[in-house]
Amino acid sequence: MTQKANWNYPTSVRFGAGRVAELADVCKAAGIARPLFVTDPGLAALPMTRAAVESLNGLGVGVFSEIKSNPVESNVAAGVAVLRAGKHDGVVAFGGGSALDVGKVIAFMAGQTRPMWDFEDVGDWWTRADPKGIAPVIAVPTTSGTGSEVGRAGVITQEATHTK
């Protein structure tokens, strides 16, 4: 049997020293006027993170850092609540795999009305999502290895069953 496939991963990647200074411009280009900056508690306390947040000061930036190293659904729910309460219209996910995964899922869930688990990466469950309810997301990886910045999925633990 001959297999044919097409692969399209239209993720724009910027890299190089000092590129974080472009965050405000990247947000504006993505239509984000009030970004929610999502990171983990350890990174939130570092000068490089403060500098990244300060680069967004001209925008209505908020910060969310209530993320466990192996994120759980309550981390996502808390982030979605902060996003909605602050009227944020996009996400800047900053950190390693956990922060990037939570940031992506917060952006995905921003305008959804169904529970997060209705969108597991199983079969065609993704078709249940309202595409208009997905906020734009900008991922800034601070580690190498997970590739979360270019993937569509986020690994989140369901607290009731302890499954991912």
Say what each PLM segment does.
Residues 32-34, 88, 134:
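A general structural motif
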Residues 21, 111-164:
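A glycine/threonine-rich phosphate-anchoring loop and its flanking beta-alpha core
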Residues 18, 30, 47, 51, ...:
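Conserved active-site and cofactor/substrate-binding residues in soluble primary-metabolism enzymes
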Residues 1-64:
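An N-terminal, well-structured beta->alpha segment
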Residues 27, 83, 129-130:
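Structural motif
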Residues 36-37, 90-92, 138:
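Conserved beta-strand elements of the Class I
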Residues 44-115:
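N-terminal small/polar loop signature for handling phosphorylated ligands or for N-terminal nucleophile
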